[in-house]
Amino acid sequence: SSAASDVYKRQDLDIYTGVAYGLKDVIIDQWIATHKEYEKKDAKTVYYLSMEFLTGRALGNIIINLSACKEIKEAIEELGLDLNVIEDQEPDAALGNGGLGRLAACFLDSLATLGYPAYGCGIRYKYGMFKQKIVDGYQVEVPDEWLKNGNPFEVRREEYACEVKFGGYTRWVKGEDGRERVVQDGYRSVRAVPYDLPIVGYGNNVVNTLRIWDAEPVQHFVLDSFNKGDYIKATEEESLAKNIVEVLYPCDDHYAGKELRLKQQYFFVSASVQTAIKKYLDNHDDVRNLPEKVVFQLNDTHPTICVAELMRLLMDEYDLTWDEAWAVTTKCCAYTNHTIMAEALEKWPIELFSKLLPRCYQIIEEIN
């Protein structure tokens, strides 16, 4: 009966979850040890910035890389179950779509297996692209709810949450030291919260990190608006934040879609660069030496706002001059080109870009 089959499906899902959490316990110790080793060696770290990471299912990959296949297969078979059926309970991580994302995932695998310090940095999409259904012989696109049962391998890192600002205007202010600095006012902001996923190297006890960012409102619920009967305004900030992480490549043949894509790109780049600089400054004093320990690898055009954002942070937050910031930025950013097709090389209307990212637009004008 269908009720009985639902029970068996649930049982398989519960066993998958149990195996995943058991493996995660093993991985966590290696994960911590890996990062302690990198810190001890003061190793240079690559941050691989990409809109996509097509990692596939984690469980099977982790079992192989830990060389634990025989033991886990035997344990599962003792329960009268099939490891392949258990692995099938895991949804594909809806974090990528094509070659761009597969390349990113392959690089992360390879970097971990070779023992290089590396972070993948991207977005924790709620739905990814879409799930295909065929109805009456035609494709129907439905949301891919890959996170509906949670992701047992992810770790929420609240302590690394940071603010990302959109819109507003810039003005110059003179500090107590007499130097003029740019500040941004009248902006709207969202809170970027990272979720870390383990990238397990093959047979070497190395566990690197894929850090995917979720967007949350700075204030979840405005009680004052709700009490005045403005129910939409009460949750407006939440809606604005959640839109950023709903889908990979939202439709951009209208203004709102273009704006959302640019928001997505700036959101994860700003959060990743902010945390990379803070991590560097935990153990080093002079941000001008950043290129000795940090490099940002930009996977195609989507994360290239990194150049302007790094300049912005170095000048406006860390008080470097233009020339000092430029010397750091040119040594810190590397780029992977995927295509020269005109339609794939992104362009943004100046009016949209300057309104959404006013300070980055000023910096790009100055670079030009």
Residue locations for each model-derived region?
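Compact, glycine/acidic-enriched structural inserts
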Residues: 66-87, 91, 131-160, 227-231
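Conserved oxyanion/phosphate-binding beta-strand-loop segments in alpha/beta enzyme cores
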Residues: 21-87, 225-243, 267-288
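Extended, well-ordered alpha-helical scaffold/bundle regions in very large, multi-domain proteins
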Residues: 307-366
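Extended, regular secondary-structure scaffolds
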Residues: 97, 113-196
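Active-site cores of enzymes that catalyze phosphoryl transfer or operate on phosphate-rich substrates
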Residues: 156-299, 348-368
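Glycine-rich phosphate/pyrophosphate-binding loops
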Residues: 107-131, 321-341
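Short, small-residue-biased leader/transition segments that mark boundaries at the very start
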Residues: 3-8
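Core structural elements
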Residues: 43-47, 51-53, 296-309, 332-339
